Curated annotation (Swiss-Prot):
Region named Arg/Asp/Glu-rich domain: 442-477
A Gene Ontology term for the protein's cellular component: nucleus
Lineage: Eukaryota, Metazoa, Chordata, Craniata, Vertebrata
The protein's name in its UniProt record: Pre-mRNA 3'-end-processing factor FIP1
Region Sufficient for interaction with AHCYL1, annotated ranges: 478-535
Sequence ranges of Polar residues compositional bias: 320-330, 419-435
Record gene name: Fip1l1
GO molecular function: enzyme regulator activity; RNA binding
InterPro entries xref list: Fip1_dom, Pre-mRNA_3'-end_processing_reg
Record field: compositional bias (Basic and acidic residues): 1-10, 32-42, 271-282, 439-479, 488-515
Spans annotated as Sufficient for interaction with CPSF4: 136-219
Residues the record lists as Phosphothreonine modifications: 481
Compositionally biased residues, Low complexity: 247-267
Cell location: Nucleus
Length: 581
């Protein structure tokens, strides 16, 4: 609001419009002086500050202003004023007086729809803090500070009162991330050395650079002009012959390129966390490119937002000659999928050397080469190479992490170069079903052997049971009935027959035991059976001796009884042999 409008309002309040309007707007005649001073202040806004303070430091007499807690000055009416003036204090709540510098765009309050008035009143004798504009929000990139001192430069020894050393204090209230006083000092010292360039990170003397650039915008000129952030890595030596292959456009190369770039970015993050370089603003703000120091091969890859019709071009450049690569086949090549044999390398040393042309071809092809491919040392068939030569490392692994060209397959004096067309991936080249079939077959053989062992044990148990039942039957058949022992002659006749029967069965029993021992061939079984047979023989020999003594005594009685008793013996043998059969 300009000064002319303020004067116009003052004239309206002083006219015949009524004291009510004046009281309603300004609360009393004393406000006229205030607004006249305000008009002067608005006109003299560009004048020097001391003049403004002198003009506003002398308010009209009879008026005392109280500064409320919110900075709004409430006028205090003197006792000489009327009661109507004191009653109009309720209407003064709509008048907001701002003390201090008023900036444009600040909220302005009006009363009852009237045009808002900015009141710039300087209160004398009262000093306020700096009310200048402050930056809104929190600067996340700004380093922390304690009382204006950067956090990494604060000396912990300068604190007189160290509350974390007090008994019962929780160290995590003062140090984050597991730091304590000593480790924090060491960390600050290391950060200072890194930022000053004094901290030297050891890097192996190799020259392989892998550049992974993220955030593709489609403009190759701008991408080339972007600054690159560098982090050093070590890479195993390359074992491939490298060249500049033509660009390959395939959807599989896009997918494998994205996964490889993701792996590279995750490994960079882990490396930064390990060496504490995540604090540097370059690594934190720029997605940038990553140069990996390795061998003399430079691999550049771009990953970002890809469209459906956009193809990824992978370029491999080499500074090394072919002879250097050929002489470096001592270590295995990097980035091979697990379980897949490197098809471009010679066979392992445990295989027989490749035969000459005069000898017969081997029955088993070398690992990684299909059956339709002629073995090394034999000339290939005339004409174009068979299609089985195509799925090599160039096609199956072309869009992987390294994308290096593979060596050609040497067969005799002819070397077949790899074709750059798409071909099946690594799992299709290696037939893993044979390995699983071998393991399954071996498990089946083991189960079959276990079943055979169980069957043998069952047969042995059955043989033992049969032998026991036979012995029981023999004892039952040869055991005398009460009717047999009617006379001494019959008792003698039975004992003589039992003696002959034992002698007859002894030979057959020994044969069966020998056959059983030869069939089982187990030490425990042999020991057990031999002890059983020995005890049986001892028992039988004792019985035979007792029978012979008894027979000698009976022979003295009568010769007639012997002759009479010798006749029914064959009959008894025939009758007893019939049920045995």
């Amino acid at each position: 609001m300009s000064a002319g409008e303020v004067e116009r309002l003052v004239e309206l309040s002083g006219g015949t419009g009524g004291d009510e309007e004046e009281e309603w707007l300004y609360g009393g005649p004393w406000d006229v002086h205030v607004h006249s001073d305000l008009a002067k202040d608005l006109d003299e806004n560009e004048v020097e500050r001391p003049e403004e303070e002198n003009a506003s430091a002398n308010p009209p007499s009879g008026i005392e202003e109280e500064a409320a807690e919110n900075g709004v000055a409430k006028p205090k009416v003197t006792e000489t004023e009327d009661d109507s003036d004191s009653d109009s204090d309720d209407d003064e709540d709509d008048v907001h007086v701002t003390i201090g510098d008023i900036k444009t765009g600040a909220p302005q309050y009006g009363s009852y729809g009237t045009a808002p008035v900015n009141l710039n009143i300087k209160a004398g004798g009262r000093v306020y803090g700096n009310t200048g504009t402050k930056v809104k929000g929190v600067d996340l990139d700004a380093p922390g500070s304690i009382n204006g001192v950067p956090l990494l430069e604060v000396d912990l020894d300068s604190f007189e009162d160290k509350p974390w050393r007090k008994p019962g204090a929780d160290l995590s209230d003062y140090f984050n991330y597991g730091f304590n006083e000593d480790t924090w000092k060491a960390y600050c010292e290391k950060q200072k050395r890194i930022r000053m360039g004094l901290e030297v990170i050891p890097v192996t003397s190799t020259t392989n650079k892998i550049t992974v650039q993220q955030g593709r915008t489609g403009n190759s000129e701008k991408e080339a002009a972007l600054p690159s952030t560098k982090a050093e890595f070590t890479s195993p030596p390359s074992l491939f012959k490298t060249g500049l292959p033509p660009s390959r456009n395939s959807t599989s190369s896009q997918s494998q390129t994205s996964t490889a770039s993701r792996k590279a970015s995750s490994s960079v993050g882990k490396w930064q966390d390990r060496y504490g370089r995540a604090e540097s603003p370059d690594l934190r703000r720029l997605p940038g490119a990553i140069d990996v120091i390795g061998q003399t091969i430079t691999i550049s890859r771009v990953e970002g937002r890809r469209r459906a019709n956009e193809n990824s071009n992978i370029q491999v450049l080499s500074d090394r000659s072919a002879t250097e690569v050929d002489n470096n086949f001592s270590k295995p090549p990097p980035f091979f999928p697990p379980g897949a044999p490197p098809t471009h390398l010679p066979p392992p040393p445990f295989l027989p050397p490749p035969p000459t042309v005069s000898t017969a071809p081997p029955l088993i092809p070398p690992p990684g080469i299909p059956i339709t491919v002629p073995p090394p040392g034999f000339p290939p068939p005339p004409g174009a190479p068979p299609p089985s030569l195509i799925p090599t490392i160039e096609s199956g692994h072309s869009s992987g992490y390294d994308s290096r060209s593979a060596r050609a397959f040497p067969y005799g004096n002819v070397a077949f170069p790899h074709l750059t067309s798409s071909a099946p991936s690594w799992p299709s080249l290696v037939d893993t079903t044979k390995q699983w079939d071998y393991y399954a077959r071996r498990e089946k053989d083991r189960d079959r052997d276990r079943e055979r062992d169980r069957d043998r044990e069952r047969e042995r148990d059955r043989d033992r049971e049969r032998e026991r039942t036979r012995e029981r039957e023999r004892e039952r058949d040869h055991s005398p009935t009460p009717s047999v022992f009617n006379s001494d002659e019959e008792r003698y006749r039975y004992r003589e027959y039992a003696e002959r029967g034992y002698e007859r069965h002894r030979a057959s029993r020994e044969k069966e035991e020998r056959h059983r021992e030869r069939r089982h061939r187990e030490k425990e079984e042999t020991r057990h059976k031999s002890s059983r047979s020995n005890s049986r023989r001892r028992h039988e020999s004792e019985e035979g001796d007792s029978h012979r003594r008894h027979k000698h005594k009976k022979s003295k009685r009568s010769k007639e009884g012997k002759e009479a008793g010798s006749e029914p013996v064959p009959e008894q043998e025939s009758t007893e042999a019939a049920p045995a059969e």
